[in-house]
Structure formats: structure tokens, C-alpha cells
Amino acid sequence: MGSALMFTDTHEWILDNGDGSVTIGISNQAQQLLGDVVFVDMPEVGDNTQAGETFSLVESVKAASDLYAPVTGEIIEINEELEDSPELINESPYSAGWIVKIKLADRNELNNLMSSEDYLAANAE
């Protein structure tokens, strides 16, 4: 996990792409809790997200879990690989298993996210 990653308390990770957009996925801890991911309900490119609102759903052999948008903005790209290979979330949650890219409406919302260190400390067993 890179130190540039930021996190939410609902286990989404966020990477600032440096161009006004962010990449979002779920944390390694989240994928471990879910177990084998079998389906991702992908949003549509062009959909708007509202920070704190659900934007997607991940289904595993154990449970279905809503994903919450960490930022307000517009979905500009989805990871189409997940439609045929949802297991990428388990195999590579921080790279090949990314879920969406969002164009930020307000960069200041990134200040509300946790650092990698804070996330790990908050979720230490």
C-alpha cells in the first residue's frame, strides 16, 4: 500500500491522480473481510457522485457491500476488467482492482480523508 493513498472509514482507498481526478477502490482489509468477490455493480461513466453516498456495490461469496463515494464529482472512467474478472479486487486491490476514476468537484474534500498511517492505526486488530 503506497503512502500516497488516502482512505475512508468505510474502507475505500483514494489515489490523487494529480490532474483533478482520483482513482478509487476498496482496501485490502475490506476485500479480506468480504472474501472472494464475485460481482461488482459498476456505475456509469458520466454519473455524478456525492461524498458519503453509495455509488457501487461489491458482492462476494459472504456478503454484498455498498461502496461509498469519498468525494463529490463525476465518474470519468470505470474499470471494465472487473465486469469479467471481479476477483482482481481480491488479487490486487491497490492496482488492477481499482473500481472508478472520479473528476473532483471540490479538491478540499481530500482533506477529510485518512492517511495510510491513520487508516492502519484505526483498523489495527
Curated annotation (Swiss-Prot):
Highest taxon of source: Bacteria
The UniProt record lists the keyword Transferase: no
GO CC terms, sorted: cytosol; glycine cleavage complex
Keywords, in A-Z order: Lipoyl
Residue positions, PTM N6-lipoyllysine: K62
Record-annotated Lipoyl-binding domain positions: 21-103
Cofactor comment: Binds 1 lipoyl cofactor covalently.
Matching Pfam families: GCV_H
Cofactor: (R)-lipoate
One GO BP annotation of this record: glycine decarboxylation via glycine cleavage system
Keyword tRNA-binding: no
InterPro entries named in the record: Biotin_lipoyl (IPR000089), GCV_H (IPR002930), GCV_H/Fam206 (IPR033753), GCV_H_sub (IPR017453), Single_hybrid_motif (IPR011053)
Subunit structure comment from the entry: The glycine cleavage system is composed of four proteins: P, T, L and H.
Functional note: The glycine cleavage system catalyzes the degradation of glycine. The H protein shuttles the methylamine group of glycine from the P protein to the T protein.
Family, per entry: Belongs to the GcvH family.
Protein name, as recorded: Glycine cleavage system H protein
Lineage: Bacteria, Pseudomonadati, Pseudomonadota, Gammaproteobacteria, Alteromonadales
GN (gene name): gcvH
